Curated annotation (Swiss-Prot):
Upper classification of the organism: Bacteria, Pseudomonadati, Pseudomonadota, Gammaproteobacteria, Thiotrichales
The UniProt record lists the keyword S-adenosyl-L-methionine: yes
Organism: Hydrogenovibrio crunogenus (strain DSM 25203 / XCL-2)
Protein name: Ubiquinone biosynthesis O-methyltransferase
InterPro entries for the chain: SAM-dependent_MTases_sf, UbiG_MeTrfase
Record's function text: O-methyltransferase that catalyzes the 2 O-methylation steps in the ubiquinone biosynthetic pathway.
Family: Belongs to the methyltransferase superfamily. UbiG/COQ3 family.
MF-aspect GO terms: 2-polyprenyl-6-hydroxyphenol methylase activity; 3-demethylubiquinol 3-O-methyltransferase activity; polyprenyldihydroxybenzoate methyltransferase activity
Catalysed reactions, semicolon-separated: a 3-demethylubiquinol + S-adenosyl-L-methionine = a ubiquinol + S-adenosyl-L-homocysteine + H(+); a 3-(all-trans-polyprenyl)benzene-1,2-diol + S-adenosyl-L-methionine = a 2-methoxy-6-(all-trans-polyprenyl)phenol + S-adenosyl-L-homocysteine + H(+)
Binding site for S-adenosyl-L-methionine: 44, 63, 84, 128
Length: 241
């Protein structure tokens, strides 16, 4: 299937996919366009491990991009499948996994289509920095809930929608500090935690805990915090029955 065909998927934004495809070759440059993703990645792993061990678990990484999180999960002992609709980015993910000899099963497919044929298959589903880039985040959340096993864990991360998140995640991060490429985010697509939780509960997921990601511009360091006002992560569990 061509990228043009993938762009027509009901829950794909062609401009978002094209933007990420254009940046595909910079995905693994830790000082480049996606440097911030590399820096927060250890925090994402740390957050997941608070609730579920990774070793020997079946894991689905939704919107895996170039594979930053997928590879880390695999190196921690997970049996990882990464899915995305950006073809060039997924090619980079596959090539990098070969270079690093890290086993990740990558597939060019939507979350919704994958969940149809892999229902209740995964111990863990992750969907990081992805919901704010799709037209219908609720559809992704429902697909994640469908793919995870009863009693399994689903982890989301996205951006809160408020004045502070606009100032820090768009104006400061994109325009001033160049932490992420200009045009990466659209403030209207940001999702408040209460909105995400309502969608997750409708999908049969139950909130266990949340955490924020805070950036210190002087030290250029990220840390987990209890404030969810800008970048945040939420941990959900599917009912065991």
């Amino acid at each position: 299937m061509s990228q043009a065909d993938l762009n027509k998927h009901k829950n794909a934004d062609p401009s978002e996919l094209n933007n990420f495809n254009q940046l595909a070759n910079t995905w693994w440059d830790e000082s480049g366009e996606f440097g911030a993703l590399h820096k927060i990645n250890p925090l994402r792993i740390e957050f997941i491990k608070q609730f579920q061990s990774i070793e020997n678990k079946t894991i689905l990484d939704v919107g895996c991009g170039g594979g930053i999180l997928s590879e880390s999960l695999a190196k921690a002992g997970g049996n990882v499948t990464g899915i995305d609709l950006a073809e060039d980015v997924l090619t980079i993910a596959r090539l990098h996994s070969l270079d690093t000899e890290t086993k990740v099963n990558y597939h060019l497919i939507s979350a919704e289509d994958h969940a149809q044929t892999h229902e209740e298959e995964y111990d863990i589903v992750t969907c990081m920095e992805m919901l704010e880039h799709v037209p219908d985040p609720a559809s992704i959340i429902h697909a994640a809930a469908k793919a995870v096993k009863p009693g399994g864990w689903v982890f989301f991360s996205t951006l809160n929608r408020n004045y502070k998140s606009y100032l820090l995640a768009i104006f400061a991060a994109e325009q001033v500090l160049n932490l992420v490429p200009k045009g990466t985010h659209t403030h209207d697509k940001f999702i408040q935690p209460s909105e995400l939780d309502a969608m997750a509960r409708q999908a049969g997921l139950f909130l266990k805990e949340g955490a924020g990601i805070d950036f210190n511009p002087l030290l250029k360091r990220y840390r987990l915090t209890d404030r969810l006002d800008v970048n945040y992560l939420l941990a959900y569990q599917k009912s065991a029955v």
